[in-house]
UniProtKB/Swiss-Prot annotation:
Pfam families recorded: WD40
Topology in the lipid bilayer: Peripheral membrane protein
Protein name: Mitochondrial division protein 1
UniProt-annotated location(s): Mitochondrion outer membrane
Protein source organism: Aspergillus terreus (strain NIH 2624 / FGSC A1156)
Gene Ontology cellular component terms for the protein in this record: mitochondrial outer membrane; transferase complex
Keyword Nucleotide-binding: no
Amino acid sequence: MDKHRRDESPSGLSDIVEPDGLLGTGLTSRHIEAFGRKVTTTAGHLMAPSSTEATTGSHYHSAMVDIQRELRRPNTQRRVFSLTQTTPTDLVRSKLSTTEIQSRAISSLPDDLLANIPEDSSSYSLFEGFQASQDDHEYRKVHRRRISKGKKLLKDGDARAALPSTPTDLKKDRDILSRRLDLMGVRKNMCSSEIHEIDNKIANLHNMRKIVLDRLAGLEMEEAELEHELTELDNKLEDLQEEQPESQAAVATPKSSEANEDSFVSEDPAMDASFMSESIYQKMSSPKSIKQRSIRKRSMPILHEHFAPGSQIKEMPAHNDMVTAIDFDFPFGTMVSAALDDTVRVWDLNVGRCTGLLEGHNASVRCLQIEDNIVATGSMDASVKLWDLSRARSVTRDGRVNKDDEGEDTADDAHELFQSTTLEDCYVYSLDAHVDEVTALHFRGDTLISGSADKTLRQWDLVKGRCVQTLDVLWAAAQASTLGGDTQWRPSGRLPDASADFVGALQCFDAALACGTADGMVRLWDLRSGQVHRSLVGHTGPVTCLQFDDVHLVTGSLDRSIRIWDLRTGSIYDAYAYDKPVTSMMFDSKRIVAAAGENVVKVYDKADGHHWDCGAGVGADAEGPSPATVERVRLKDGFLVEGRKDGIVSAWTC
């Protein structure tokens, strides 16, 4: 039977169980000692690998010895087994498994370790401490106080805040605050040093940028000179190619020195008439044809794109009186200006120097246009003259044209020569058909349209040099009134202004012509039929300037307003006004610039609708002399040129 019970014990403890023992349970002192040794060995085996110090292993060993001693006492045994209904053998068999013993040995802590834990006298709970240790952004947004900033974290001294401070603690706190204050000073000095370093870097970058801009300006000047020389060589080659067939034809027709005088007299009267007709036509003066020699720009100037908007590029004292007309072909290219001093000057915008004068008109020039090499000027002498700048001779270093290479002049003589030199070879021909001053003109391709104070518009063929069509503005207005239309001549109801021309502005494109007149109306003409296609009514004063593109037409008037029209519907797309009358206007892809009777150019940004001023009057000293009023403006690719009442012409970035 004993053998059978020993074999049934799966834990190997059946050899210590006997029917008789302490308290009638069969558990003797020898059995308890054996059980204690096994538990001690098992616990030491389980806990030793997790202990890193020898003291920890000895601690567990002594704890097990104490447990063994307690279990050997009869009182302890009675208390332990008094409440159990089963024998200790059954308890050990059913409850104390290997997994449970391992779990209890790991999770249980002795009283010695628990006795060393200090008592927490802090009034903060564990959860409150966890909340205080977090970076509470919402709290900082609501409570932005300098004192509470950075004071959310709990510190060791917070628990002792309620206790009375000792001098030692106060000195310690003072030293800590003093050190923090010193660190703040060091950090401020570091920030100041970084700011100075950044300022120095920015200044160095500005200097480097200025150096690169100067280098770019030099490259563009050199590029302009090379392109000018290349254009001259191309023109010479074309002239040689034209002269070569003429010389070959002259050589192919030999002159007979033995010819009789009677051979020049023919018996056939028809032949005599043919000969006389040919000789007459050879002696008649025929107008020179315009030969379009386009300027071959391989690259456009980009220097002005690197300046801030509103920066001045050049200022030239161009004339001695008010500027009446101004135009240029492209940025840093060729500019032509006219004024009431009866002069027309050609300028090189790249260097800001006058290259010559266009002389031939008997009065002041009121309007002009430059396209490639061709310049058209309309004057108060009722004529339109055309000039070909590609025929000009090489310009000397002192700005003179047609200067002889022989001889040297003094500075005064050079200045006088510069003032009297003209581009005489550039004159092509004159268009004389108007009977009053020409106030507006525009040409594109082989077609030129001119408007005059004689209340007519004339269409010119630049190839033949003659007028092909005359448009009567008054007749068109009367015709529209007779047909019952809403377009008729509408007097403004006030005294005519000296600057209010009958034809204030015009522009043509193929068969389309837009014309603004003194009655405040803008008429759209069809050059194929010579009829008014549409009339735009809106201005209450004379129209002084206009320009259109594919979709919109922009007009300026003496009624102080600028109106943007939709060409597709004929309605007003946008409008704005200034304090004084608008005398000149032009736009590009980004901005609309206007001269509105002030010493600044009015600029309107198309994208955001922002209005700002550009010119010498911006930031001018109120006590000093005020710049003159802007009379004429021209804008191309962000390059602005404005002419003033005192004759000064300036170039700006816009």
